[in-house]
Amino acid sequence: MSGFSAAWLALREPADVAARSTQVTATVLSSLVGRTPLRGVDLGSGTGSNIRYLSPRLPTCDWRLVDNDAALLDVARHALGDLNPRATSINIETRVADLQTLDSTVLDGCALVTASALLDLVSESWLARLVRLARDAGAHVLMALNYDGRIVCSPPERDDDLVRDLVNRHQVTNKGFGSALGPKAGVRAEALLRDAGYDVCRAPSDWVLGAEHAELQRQVIEGWAHAATELAPDLSPRIQSWTERRIAHLSAGTSHLVVGHDDVGGILTARG
């Protein structure tokens, strides 16, 4: 994990920051204030965008960033070097690891397990194992930007629903962790955390993309078209026509996309 380029991660980061649920974040982080030592583990870290968001809000926390892409972690390490100039004792550790196997040692000594835009890619069994490991470590959980299946395109176009439905079918195919949770990720995370003894909060964290996100919109639209065509190659002409119409709206400065996500937080109140 991660399988995404540094350029893509940089492009989406402002939309991610704007989308996140401040309520879910504040609820989880406030439960950790005063806890020492305090270490967070971020899974599928990429270039460290999740830590750029969280560290100023939890300035006494050390971080372990975990990804299978050493090049992205190198970008993260350099970008995060002076993240908290007031907190000179903050330690940023990076670890190259295969998240598919989710070695329990990755969570050693952690009080918080985080990830961003990860859970919709993983399987139910993988998520259940993560919840068990987090509980056994005594760690709270904060999982941001889980895709939930909602796509609203404006102005509306013929075949918006067709493409959305194909995208959502594609979302549950194997992304390297077994059959992916896709749009069910947030709901299943909420249920599994609650069953494991966590107090859980979940709230929308939708991408709202306007003219200022033109390049992000373009890449999202083209990505949807690619996924839809993979599942329904016989519908390729319709999907291509839809793509051209959506890009025309984008070129005219009138395109607006809402892409549904949710954030899930878990505060551990019982040890099983």
Residue ranges and their predicted role:
Residues 139-204:
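Conserved catalytic/acceptor-binding region of the Class I
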Residues 44:
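Conserved S-adenosyl-L-methionine
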Residues 48-52:
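Glycine-rich SAM-binding Motif I of class I
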Residues 1-35, 47:
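Class I SAM-dependent methyltransferase Rossmann-like catalytic core
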Residues 54-101:
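Class I SAM-dependent methyltransferase SAM/SAH-binding core
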Residues 114:
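A conserved beta-strand element that flanks and buttresses the S-adenosyl-L-methionine
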Residues 201-252:
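C-terminal helical/coil "lid" or tail adjacent to the Rossmann-like core of SAM-dependent
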Residues 121-134:
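A short, conserved alpha-helix within the catalytic core of class I
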